[in-house]
Amino acid sequence: MSGSVKESLQLQLLEMEMLFSMFPNQGEVKLEDVNALTNIKRYLEGTREALPPNIEFVITLQIEEPKVTIDLQVTMPHNYPYVALQLFGRSPELDRQQQLLLNQALSAYLRTFDPGELCVCAAIQWLQDNSASYFLTRKLSDEPSVQAKPVKNTFLRMWIYSHHIYQQDLRKKILEVGKRLDVTGFCMTGKPGIICVEGFKNHCEEFWHTIRYPNWKHISCKHAESVETEGDGEDLRLFHSFEELLLEAHGDYGLRNDYHMNLGQFLEFLRKHKSEHVFQILFGIESKSSES
């Protein structure tokens, strides 16, 4: 492990050198600990035994249009760039909602990088290229002569069908991705496998992309429901969390991986969550009303 940490620290020093060359003026890059880089160099040279603290710093970015500043707070974990970078952008010109949306978009961009890729410089470039729209939205809301339109988001619900979902590692991945992206819904394991995911459109689409790749072939999105909302979408959710749905197998198959799920139980589950109409879409079978 020490070798990988040292390799990571060497890459961090390299990236810090690039940052200081990009921001040569005093105060543009502010280290939380002015001795941080010296301590890391001593550790790499072997004159310091204890692992030095993480590199933490703030970069003040000047955005040209509109004329505003962003303070980018960065923490480099010891194993960065092989683990995720910790960073957050702040500006007094952004309200809480716009600042949240800006950082969510920045985080989504950074997740496209492969482990081992340095990304602080790329994050800076992304902010310089993409942050203006978040400030312009705030500017419109501050102008009394113009009635600002609320920011609209698309709330999406996807119904995903798979021939089967058995493997433990796949089931674990689905749950982890669902909880990380702050979506709600369920994953019904067995044969067939059904996944419902709901939340803001960008989160659902990232979920769909992540679980499909690199090699899940027998899976498709059978149905999608979307609606524009100006709120947080909580009132549109049919589920309160993202959980694994375990129903009885149809017949006594024990632990064999060829059991069919009890679709009658699944239909009752859909009814409880106001989704009975999806049953026919998923299976081509018209559900029988419980009132008939």
Swiss-Prot record:
Residues 14-134 form the RWD domain. InterPro entries: Phi-like, Prp3_C, RWD_dom, UBQ-conjugating_enzyme/RWD. SMART domains: RWD. It comes from the Eukaryota. PANTHER family: RWD DOMAIN CONTAINING PROTEIN 2, RWD DOMAIN-CONTAINING PROTEIN 2A. This is RWD domain-containing protein 2A. It comes from Mus musculus. The gene is Rwdd2a.
